[in-house]
Amino acid sequence: MGLIYKGFLKIFHKVWKNVEVEDQKRMKTLVLPDDVSFEDFKYGEDDDPYHTFSIYWPKDKDLTKLPILIDIHGGAWAYGDKELNRPFCMTMAHRNLIVMGMSYRLIEGVQVNNQLEDIINSINGFIKVAKERKYNLNNVFLTGDSAGGYFALSLASLLDRKLINPILGLNLNIDFKGLILNHPAFDFDIMGQTHFWYPLLFRAMFGKKYKKNPIYVNTKNTKVLMDNVYLPPMLFITSTGDDVMGEINIDVLKEIKRYYPNIEVINNDIDPKGHVYNVAYMNSDSAIKTNDKILNFILSISKK
């Protein structure tokens, strides 16, 4: 197991290094909106470059009245930072939202527990700034793409079950009005049945005895995350062109609907695009339509 695990890690991180090269090329082709301002902030008490977040807002608007969207980037728990989703955050701010996106440490050096700590600390840092600027903290939505979708759902579920402090020793005082799961990577039971290497990834994420890790235990599948748990209105985004999570998301949606039958779904099957297409290619026609639907979802709930 030791040699197999080490071999997996070597290949896994090499794959994501290659993704980084391609992402740099892709991001140079994107056209960013010119009516959005942003500011970068640090969180935590150290100078770790991953302990940063950014706030984006539309120019010349009354920011005290706008909905807030907190975005958690994906990258298989092992890749990326807030810059990866800067174009997506900017395009959503262009739609008259205040958007916050954070960096968090990656599993090459830490585990998922630490990543959740980073995400919570970044949100607490944002809350402090939001209070100073008189943003409307009663109108906050949470989204994440791919692995970020896992973090978004897990955070909302752990928050309702009051497990954040007992497990992580942290506090988070916020109510999310809505949850947007964008091509999410979760339900480890279903994922583990699709590829032999997923248990190796879970070990990297949660430790050698990952099945005993309290975060794994409390976020490992849809039943644990949703059964007898209050979650806000949810929007689930997938695509038949998603060759990463598409087939898994079909089974995940079936599970979700056992607990939340009224979940709203965007399934891009008419013009199928790849994994997290509305984040990666936010200028494309399909992405524009999907991101407009995200906005409509937010506004429909904001008015209630």
Model-derived segments and spans:
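Alpha/beta-hydrolase superfamily serine-hydrolase fold, recognizing
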Residues: 1-304
